[in-house]
A protein has these predicted regions:
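N-terminal maturation segment of proteins
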Residues: 1-195
Length: 195
């Protein structure tokens, strides 16, 4: 794990540069000139109890979350959406489409060579996948009132490396506030992208 905000910022810059270069070199996605620095999804925070789940992954290597949430993920996707004047394509309103795209990117970039020389990053993406897989049945159980938030939190924490109670609780509560199927949408959306 990085020992300072500066070291972490350097890791983010390195991941961003690596991803952008790969996108251009492999002619995967055109990056419009108006797309500049898109920042990061996980800021540097020193917590008394140590890093939370997302920080455990991100601080080790920002690449997985950068793909999902920054470029070519959510921030990039959202910026392109705001610049798209098409009445249909200019409006992305499906959570399954949005989250599915992010998950698809993680999987796709493992398969097209971006991570060939950094196999430990694949492990980080697989840890994300473990948490997402655990979230699928729990999303259903919460909506059916078959499990409480506390039960889901405990169930997830038993199955997911590094998962802390705070992140698990926030995710469980998000699923109760969103339309049913939000947790499923990550996986279903990715499968739809693959089709």
């Amino acid at each position: 794990l990085p020992e300072s905000a500066g070291e972490y910022a350097a890791r983010i810059d390195s991941a961003d540069t690596r991803i952008r270069r790969f996108l251009v070199k492999e002619d995967i996605i055109t990056i419009p000139d108006y797309v500049k620095d898109l920042d990061t999804n996980v800021p540097w925070i020193v917590r008394p109890g140590g890093p939370n789940f997302w920080e455990q992954v991100q601080f080790r290597n920002p690449t997985p979350d950068h793909l999902h949430a920054v470029i070519p993920g959510h921030r990039f996707d959202g910026l392109l959406e705001r610049h798209n004047t098409h009445p249909i394509r200019g409006k992305i309103t499906s959570a399954a489409r949005t989250e599915g795209w992010g998950v698809y990117l993680e999987e796709a970039f493992m398969n097209v060579g971006l991570l060939d020389d950094v196999p430990r990053v694949r492990e980080l993406i697989h840890i994300f996948g473990i948490f997402r897989a655990a979230r699928v049945p729990a999303d259903v159980w919460l909506q059916l009132n078959e499990m409480t938030v506390d039960e889901v939190v405990a169930w997830w924490m038993e199955r997911t490396p590094w998962l802390d109670e705070n992140v698990a609780r926030v995710d469980a509560e998000i699923y109760l506030r969103r339309p049913p199927g939000y947790g499923l949408g990550y996986t279903i959306g990715m499968l739809q992208m693959q089709q």
